[in-house]
Amino acid sequence: MCPTDAISGIAPDTITVEGRGWGHGRGLQQWGALGYAVDHGWSYEQILQHYYSNTTSSYVADREIKVHITRNNEMDLLVTSANPFTVEGIQFYGGQIVRLSAIGPHNFNIHQSGGCADPGYAVYQGHPGRVDSSGRTFIEAQPLSLNSSVDDLNQLLQVITCDRSNPAVEVSRRHYRGSLGLIEQNGQYSFNRVLREQYLRGVVPQETPSSWGTLGGGLGMQALHAQA
């Protein structure tokens, strides 16, 4: 059999590609909001009504929330800060690293450590921790200043993330507003306790680039406003 000749054709002037991103598909879509703002001139109110129809916006009182730090699941929590900080009332100097681990309910270890590769030495073995409203026990590190609205990174706590497959290797360091803690619930899980408004101040800039605000002669700011 002889292969058939290839059929030649002329490509169209416009090729439309339809698809979606990798998000959960619920609520506001950042790139969609940008398109409505820049290409259609929508205000942030119009964008919000499009994604959250039949709703009204209003002011709500700020409150504390606990945010699960999933990247640290079932791993020791390593915390440091440029300024002094405390763990359950125990003082640590700026630059020191504390390793927190949950052995079981009402049983936590607090070690001073040199980092991911160092198990450290015991500062408090078998700390009973505290009990939250759900009956789970936890311990918590707090910064020198409890004002979570500060922008000085030296005043914030920092999580040291170790490689899951090779725990002796440091992967990253990230600052957090508020306090950082370890909760025992059939395992050990890290959390960040912070005021909701301060949490949003840290999340929004990571989800949408600030450069969007200058797009479309400044119309992109409406997309950022909607996201915030």
Task: Mark where each language-model region is.
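Conserved, single-site charged/polar hotspot
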Residues: 1-228
